[in-house]
Amino acid sequence: MINTKHIFALICTFFIILPLFAQNGTPTVAGARGLAMGDASVTFRDINSAFSNQAGLAFLDEMSFTAFGEQRFLLAEIGSYSAALAYPTKSGTFGLALNYFGYENFNEQKIGLAYARELFDGVAIGAQVDYLGTRIPEYGSAGKVTFELGVQANLLENFIVGAHIFSPVRTQLTDDEIDVIPTQLNVGIAYLPTEKVTLAIELEKDFDYTASFKGGIEYQLVDELSLRVGVGTNPTQNGFGIGIHLGKLDIDIAAAYHQLLGFTPGASVSYNLSGT
């Protein structure tokens, strides 16, 4: 009997995974918080900024850890799993970010070492050195090193602007000229009219593809609960989710809906290792 799930996975392998093979390492979704908000995350100033804009790590006061997983289009074969650790010091914040995408027959790995520092009040820069690996058992493995840079700044009283570039120097992942690590630029702004509301918009440009627009809204209903929604274009995708705040522990649950491929559920657990 034909297994339709396996057929769908095969289709996704050719039309989704293989294009990603030529885009190894591009920034992962900024946790379930980012997934819910259309990944309009270049202005985040929490542990999730380890995935979207390292400059945001400069504003952390406590050592923090997060783990995030998403199952793209409900297929285990194209799941993505990430973890990050940030350690603030008087000299700046040091970070480690890890990501695994795929399954045993095709997978990509990313290891990033980050540093962020607040230069002036509300103005910070960040940088990360990445090792990117791709493994296909039948063809072997390949790995390259690249880097990413970010900046954030307060604009007026209630605005944050952010910019981040991944792999500014285009590097070939393999000897095949097609397998190039892409350059991706994200620029965004967040408006915080109150302490409970965040409105974020962002423009993302992969230098090989059409630019995409992303936007998200976060509303802290009560101290223990936040509500989130978001949208994105190219491809059209809608997101929604919640954040549960339990002292030092945050639990984020989200889902995104792709116009053709369906749902992507995701969840994050974040923990402040010091403080309250």
Specify the residue positions occupied by each region the protein language model found.
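Bacterial N-terminal signal peptides that target proteins for export
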Residues: 1-11
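Domain-scale selection of a single, long terminal region
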Residues: 2-4, 19, 85-87
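Bacterial N-terminal signal peptides
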Residues: 9-19
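Subset of outer-membrane beta-barrel
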Residues: 23-276
